[in-house]
Design a protein with these regions (language model features):
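Extracytoplasmic
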Residues: 18-53, 70-74, 160, 246-252, ...
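C-terminal ends and interior cores of transmembrane alpha-helices
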Residues: 92-105, 301-313
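C-terminal transmembrane helical hairpin of 12-TM major facilitator-type secondary transporters
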Residues: 271-275, 279-281, 286-339
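A late C-terminal transmembrane helix in Major Facilitator Superfamily
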Residues: 343-378
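Helix-to-loop junctions at the C-terminal end of transmembrane segments
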Residues: 70-82, 279-290
Length: 412
């Protein structure tokens, strides 16, 4: 709950927008290096060292699973070492990871680099960003989250092509070192200058109580796991992300035989661009919408786009379907913090975000493998993507189930 001070959150003078800028840059580099850049590392490390793709891919999987474990403890880390220290620790770990990726010579260094990347995710990833912005915004919370998380998509659109271009001109090692230096020069000043809790905020909780109100007691992860509102938010998001990750990873393989490599690449670009548009569009209205209803609508639109996609051969229709699908892919990480704030409460926000992100991360990691397995068993992607359609519709149905207007958690 935001302090009732009458502050105009729409004003550009509001300090919270500086925090949004810092979070945008954090998401830009964290997702750029930590997610979208992994395809670059796979190709370049294989080329430089002759390592098998399975070795690098296994390190990537290890990193995502380790991240899913570490983010569970985000609320404990915020209470123990503080917000700014946690973010600076994440920045240092990510920087060390990218430098090590540039300089490594042996496979054990590869796994160390990816372990450091997991620490980076813990300090600069979704949970910290959502918890921080939740404390600064009330009426414009959805817009703030949408703008900040657009940094994630922009990291894929800008940083990855830049890395590829620099690698072609100055080599992978120099490209990674240069990009790391730019990250530190851009992110470090805004973290030191802008990142802080709002005045009067209990630093361990991330909650801002209303005037005259004491903060609600925080609740344990065990209590969250027994809470129906938590599960009707986490399960549908995890299911939708499983289907989403499965489609995204297999998108080019599916489209290339139908429309060619160049057009398949264009489809990926269109989808990424529409993710930015979708986040911005949602951010303008989501604070006036029911987040569960908006989430269900996004999942249904993805199901509809996939349903048409698997039945089409027209290049135009396929590109339009990818655009429609892309419109909602970025919003799957915007809805959980909005639902948590409304139904579980600010005192348990960081704990709920960490636990929910961990669960959805583990579940969604199986998406590419499941889609690939169904494709191998059936010979094409029709049944695999039809499965994704069903999963999206099931997720939309679950997220509309409301166990109560506000979660009632048992005392820790």
């Amino acid at each position: 709950m935001i302090v009732a001070t009458g502050v105009d959150e729409s004003s550009l003078r509001y300090r919270g927008w500086r925090v949004v800028l810092a979070c945008f840059l954090m998401a830009f580099f964290m997702f750029g290096f930590g997610l979208y850049g992994q395809g670059v590392y796979l190709a370049e490390l294989q080329r430089a060292h002759g390592w098998p793709g399975t070795l690098v891919s296994a390190a990537s999987t290890f990193s995502f699973l380790l991240t899913s474990v570490l983010v569970i403890f985000t609320d404990d880390l915020l209470a123990r070492i503080g917000l700014r220290s946690l973010i600076l620790c994440g920045l240092s770990a990510l920087g060390a990871s990218t430098v090590l990726l540039a300089l490594m010579q042996t496979p054990w260094q590869l796994y160390l680099a990816y372990a450091l990347m997991s620490v980076g995710w813990t300090g600069m990833g979704t949970v910290v960003i959502a918890t921080l912005l939740n404390s600064w915004f009330d009426r414009r919370r959805g817009l703030a989250l949408s703008l900040a998380f657009n940094g994630a998509t922009c990291g894929g659109i800008v940083l990855v092509p830049l890395l590829l271009s620099l690698t072609g001109s100055i080599g992978f090692r120099s490209a990674m070192l240069a990009a790391t230096m730019v990250m530190v020069l851009l992110v470090l000043p805004v973290v030191v200058g802008f990142i802080r809790w709002p005045a009067g905020l209990p630093p361990a909780s991330g909650e801002r109580p209303a005037d005259g109100d004491a903060p609600a007691p925080a609740h344990s992860r065990k209590a969250l796991l027994a809470n129906a509102a938590f599960w009707t938010m986490v399960l549908p998001i995890a299911i939708a992300l499983l289907a989403q990750m499965g489609f995204i990873i297999h998108q080019v393989t599916f489209l290339e035989p139908l429309i060619g490599r160049a057009s398949a690449g264009l489809a990926v670009t269109i989808m990424a661009a529409m993710a930015v548009v979708g986040r911005l569009s949602l951010g303008l209205f989501v604070d006036r919408l029911d987040p569960r209803l908006a989430c269900a609508a996004s999942m249904t639109s993805q199901a509809a786009a996939l349903f048409v996609l698997v039945q089409s051969t027209s290049p135009t229709a396929l590109l339009v379907c990818c655009a429609i699908y892309g419109f909602s892919i970025g919003n799957m990480i915007t809805f959980p913090p909005l639902i948590i704030q409304r139904e579980i409460g600010a005192s348990s926000f960081a704990a709920a975000m960490g636990l929910g992100t961990s669960i959805s991360g583990v579940v969604s990691a199986f998406g590419p493998g499941i889609v690939g397995l169904v494709r191998s068993l059936t010979g094409d992607y029709t049944m695999a993507f039809a499965m994704c359609v069903v999963l999206d519709l099931v997720a939309a149905g679950i997220v509309l189930w409301r166990p109560g207007r506000r979660a009632k958690l048992a005392a820790s």
